């Protein structure tokens, strides 16, 4: 008995050590931004985005507190085989008060198993909700290839000249389909599951310092038995992507060409959309029709120009041509140079221009935006974070068209359509004006 009692403290210590080691193995990653800002004409900070554009130049032009908190852990490992559990909870508030209630979004919860298939060394099996191989332009917060959501897949299969990845994910639309009631009355209240099937071939070395990635995505509306879509709904579509990445000037340049059809055009990033119906009456549900095509040509990157200068840049042309004439032509160009006074202090400027032409009206909206920021960051790279910055932003815009969301679809035949700025004596778009804002912001990723 005495021997047992003497061994007990040692056993407890060993158990505590094991539990401590396991606790220390938890990975904590994430992203956050928050700050305070004012508008020159009075009131809180207002942000500037061109009507019809899918993004905006973000430096000194973000008006919310946003965070993603990721917890993950390698829960099992034997040799080169392992299982990893990953989670991500995100939230966004308007940064107007101390207490701002919000419903967090559970954006990731997945398990990734590496090297589980003997004859596919280096590959990963995964299932669950996941940010899946996302491609974006940081300076405009624009995701041009992103099929994230609940799904499953097999990735990084070594095929000799590259890595092959296969995945299936889902994005549902509210009110996407109906069941038959009586007297030809349909009640569009059932969600429609939109499935996306993704095939990618990446890391193909085609020139010194250059790699090529090719991808095909097929999206479709997956209806339940005895349900139907509204007439004209976009049932399926394709997205084709080619991306060349070149190492240059201690950074990279990415050149991207994408072509999409029908349900893959509205978001243009790989998620299927077009079966959703915002109104019970299918007579007024025309606005979900996105049959047509999209072409996107994009070049972006980040480079170092000597010891003291870094720069991000982007140039993009996007043409969404829809059968219902509600598409757009959008082109944007911008730069973000950074001058480093010390390894932790810099001055950053961002200059961006957007131009969006309405397919329906032929009119154009444009905006110039310039931001000057003094910044303190954890390192001497344009990617170094955390960063604390004080900024001043000036924007000038001239908008000739907007979307008509007055009333509702039952009493407005133009609901959701592009109209000229002065349509029917109204005021659509943001008109011709300018404004400036100033404030302070922190940004961090880890």
Swiss-Prot record:
Q: Name one GO cellular component term.
A: pore complex
Q: Which UniProt keywords apply?
A: Cell outer membrane, Disulfide bond, Host cell receptor for virus entry, Host-virus interaction, Ion transport, Membrane, Porin, Receptor, Signal, Sugar transport, Transmembrane, Transmembrane beta strand, Transport
Site positions (Greasy slide, important in sugar transport) are 31, 66, 99, 252, 383, 445
Q: Which residues lie on this side of the membrane: Periplasmic?
A: 26, 76-81, 116-122, 160-161, 205-208, 249-250, 306-307, 342-344, 377-386, 446
Which Gene Ontology BP annotations are present?
DNA damage response; maltodextrin transmembrane transport; maltose transmembrane transport; monoatomic ion transport; polysaccharide transport
Q: What is the effect of changing residue 146 to G?
A: Increases affinity for large dextrins
Pfam (any one): LamB
Q: Which stretches of this protein does UniProt put in the Extracellular compartment?
A: 41-64, 94-104, 131-156, 174-191, 223-234, 264-290, 324-326, 360-362, 400-430
Upon gene disruption, the observed phenotype is:
Resistance to phage lambda. No growth on dextrins.
Intrachain disulfide bonds? 47-63
Q: Where in the cell is it found?
A: Cell outer membrane
For this protein, the record's InterPro entries field holds: G_neg_Bact_CarbUptk_Porin (IPR050286), Maltoporin (IPR023738), Porin_LamB (IPR003192), Porin_LamB_sf (IPR036998)
Q: What protein family is recorded?
A: Belongs to the porin LamB (TC 1.B.3) family.
Record's protein name: Maltoporin
Q: Which gene encodes it?
A: lamB
């Amino acid at each position: 008995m005495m021997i047992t009692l003497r061994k007990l403290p040692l056993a407890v210590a060993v158990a505590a050590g094991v539990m401590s080691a396991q606790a220390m193995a938890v990975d904590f990653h994430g992203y956050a931004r928050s700050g305070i800002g004012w508008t020159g004409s009075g009131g809180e900070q207002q942000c500037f985005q061109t009507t019809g554009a899918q993004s905006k130049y973000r430096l000194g032009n973000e008006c919310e507190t946003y965070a993603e908190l990721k917890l993950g852990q390698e829960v099992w490992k034997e040799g080169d085989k392992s299982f990893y559990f990953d989670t991500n909870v995100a939230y966004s508030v308007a940064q107007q008060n101390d207490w701002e209630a919000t419903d967090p979004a559970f954006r990731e919860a997945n398990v990734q198993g590496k090297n589980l298939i003997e004859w596919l060394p280096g590959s990963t099996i995964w299932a669950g909700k996941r940010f899946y191989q996302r491609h974006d332009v940081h300076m405009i917060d624009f995701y041009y290839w992103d099929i994230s959501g609940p799904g499953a897949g097999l990735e990084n299969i070594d095929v000799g000249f590259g890595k092959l990845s296969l995945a299936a994910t889902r994005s549902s639309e509210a009110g996407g389909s109906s069941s038959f009631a009586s007297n030809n009355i349909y009640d569009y209240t059932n969600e429609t599951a939109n499935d996306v099937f993704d095939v990618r071939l990446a890391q193909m070395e085609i020139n010194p310092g250059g790699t090529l990635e090719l991808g095909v995505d097929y999206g479709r509306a997956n209806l339940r038995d005895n349900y139907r879509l509204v007439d004209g709904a976009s049932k399926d579509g394709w997205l084709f992507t080619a991306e060349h990445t070149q190492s240059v000037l201690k950074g990279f340049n990415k050149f991207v060409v994408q072509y999409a059809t029908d349900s893959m055009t509205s978001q243009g990033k790989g998620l299927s959309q077009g079966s959703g119906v915002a109104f019970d009456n299918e007579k007024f549900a025309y606005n979900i029709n996105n049959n047509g095509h999209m072409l996107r040509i994009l070049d972006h990157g980040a480079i170092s120009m000597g010891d003291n200068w870094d720069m991000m840049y982007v140039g993009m042309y996007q043409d969404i041509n829809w059968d219902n004439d509600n598409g757009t032509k959008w082109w944007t160009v911008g730069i973000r140079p950074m001058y480093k006074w010390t390894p932790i202090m810099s001055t950053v400027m961002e200059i961006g221009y957007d131009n969006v032409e309405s397919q329906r009206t032929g009119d154009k909206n444009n905006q110039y935006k310039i931001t000057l920021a003094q910044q303190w960051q954890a390192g001497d790279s344009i990617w170094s974070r955390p960063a604390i910055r004080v900024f001043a932003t000036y924007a000038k815009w001239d908008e000739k068209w907007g979307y008509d969301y007055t009333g509702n679809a039952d009493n407005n035949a133009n609901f959701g359509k592009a109209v000229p700025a002065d349509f029917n004596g109204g005021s659509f778009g943001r008109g011709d004006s300018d404004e400036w804002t100033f404030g302070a912001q922190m940004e961090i990723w880890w």
